[in-house]
Amino acid sequence: MKESSRKQGAASPCAACKLLRRRCAQDCVFSPYFPADEPQKFANVHRVFGASNVNKMLQELPIHQRGDAVSSMVYEANARVRDPVYGCVGAISSLQQQIDVLQAQLALAQAEVVHLRVRQSTNFPGHGLCPDSPSSSGSPSSKQVSPQDNKGMFSHMDIVDEASLGESMWSC
Amino acid sequence: MASSSNSYNSPCAACKFLRRKCMPGCIFAPYFPPEEPHKFANVHKIFGASNVTKLLNELLPHQREDAVNSLAYEAEARVRDPVYGCVGAISYLQRQVHRLQKELDAANADLAHYGLSTSAAGAPGNVVDLVFQPQPLPSQQLPPLNPVYRLSGASPVMNQMPRGTGGSYGTFLPWNNGHDQQGGNM
């Protein structure tokens, strides 16, 4: 079906062959990934990587990996076109700075949590009557539960760790 | 530095690779010294010498060093990982940001809980001087791999990019820190 339609010229060439002004063969490496209705997608990739380089890179990959390779190249090419100086490295640097900020804030928050837990546990022995405290179990006047509190905190933190976040890398 | 581009001195890594004469005005010579042949080899393989020439010519001279270093970084990432290139690193970092944001939200929830708990205790003899120091980030929920948003987020740090040689960009390889798969140095 594809053969007859291509030979008859009914099918339009892919975005790559259209830009390169050449005949779109049946086994064109670009056509599965650069449809005719997305011309800018290939234009940017061609501008940054060069069509022959992309062709070479795709040929060296197994077919089931070419889609992801094209998506990542499109992403990098778009980044390079928008920012000719830093390209993707600008995004990487920004993310690394965000990580630094978040890590600092997390350290502060966790230190404050530990501080509050210690204060709460040390305040209890001074008062014989503390029936209102919801986080206390049993008689607080005879307990030093700091280690258990720490365990509770960390076990709570463990729940937050998600080993399997969404693997959807492409949202173009 | 200017003398390094003279014809009687050794050619730059680019002209050596391309087997051509290194002219005094060679656009590659300031950024691809002959002692770093792999740097140009990677850039040439991924981007092509003519593309890089075009790209550098469109930039102001004071921007070219950063451009070359970022191109070298991306080219090395692409050589190491032909499928994902440096987008793999970006995806890894985005997951890190997401995880840290969740941990910070949980810690802030803990703080709110203890704040209410301490005030609910109503201890008259104690002065409750709680100060909630943590400041959550402004609501920048990062969409995954959106080039437009990603790059707008990148622009504030433009001026803070390190301006060293290619070696200093080794610190930007996230998998050197987070991944155990890679061996490490070039």
Swiss-Prot record, chain A:
One of its GO terms (biological process) is phloem or xylem histogenesis. GO terms for molecular function: transcription cis-regulatory region binding. Pfam families: LOB (PF03195). Residues 131-147 have a biased composition (Low complexity). InterPro entries: LOB. Residues 125-152 are annotated as: Disordered. Residues 12-113 form the LOB domain. Expressed in young shoots, roots, stems, leaves and flowers. It comes from the Eukaryota. Belongs to the LOB domain-containing protein family. This is LOB domain-containing protein 4. It comes from Arabidopsis thaliana.
UniProtKB/Swiss-Prot annotation, chain B:
Pfam families: LOB. Expressed in a band of cells at the adaxial base of all lateral organs formed from the shoot apical meristem and at the base of lateral roots. The keyword Coiled coil does not apply. Residues 10-111 form the LOB domain. One of its GO terms (molecular function) is transcription cis-regulatory region binding. Not known; ectopic expression of LOB leads to alterations in the size and shape of leaves and floral organs and causes male and female sterility. Induction: Positively regulated within the shoot apex by both ASYMMETRIC LEAVES 1 (AS1) and ASYMMETRIC LEAVES 2 (AS2/LBD6) and by KNAT1. Disulfide bonds: none annotated. The lineage of its organism: Eukaryota, Viridiplantae, Streptophyta, Embryophyta, Tracheophyta. Keywords: Developmental protein. It comes from the Eukaryota. Belongs to the LOB domain-containing protein family. InterPro entries: LOB (IPR004883). This is Protein LATERAL ORGAN BOUNDARIES. GO terms for biological process: organ boundary specification between lateral organs and the meristem.
